Swiss-Prot record:
One of its GO terms (cellular component) is cytosolic small ribosomal subunit. It comes from the Eukaryota. Belongs to the eukaryotic ribosomal protein eS28 family. GO terms for biological process: maturation of SSU-rRNA; ribosomal small subunit assembly; translation. This is Small ribosomal subunit protein eS28. InterPro entries: NA-bd_OB-fold, Ribosomal_eS28, Ribosomal_eS28_CS. The keyword Endoplasmic reticulum does not apply. The gene is RPS28A. The keyword Membrane does not apply. SUPFAM superfamilies: Nucleic acid-binding proteins. GO terms for molecular function: structural constituent of ribosome. Keywords: Ribonucleoprotein, Ribosomal protein.
Length: 67
């Protein structure tokens, strides 16, 4: 990772469910640490639980909701 790449820190506030063909992706709602009034839904690969801090390379894209 380049040291000049801007990143955004986000805290997992709720785990919404598993998705992906084999359940390897978790859909979570995150709250940005620099702007706590803003929350988005993201897909996360790998183990994740509430109160984890994620480093987002891109913070504008939001995941589609599970059905």
């Amino acid at each position: 990772m380049d040291s000049k790449t801007p990143v955004t820190l986000a805290k997992v506030i709720k785990v919404l469910g598993r998705t992906g063909s084999r359940g390897g992706v978790t859909q979570v709602r995150v709250e940005f640490l620099d702007d706590t009034s803003r929350t988005i839904v993201r897909n996360v690969k790998g183990p994740v639980r509430e109160n984890d801090i994620l480093v987002l390379m891109e913070s504008e894209r939001e995941a589609r909701r599970l059905r």
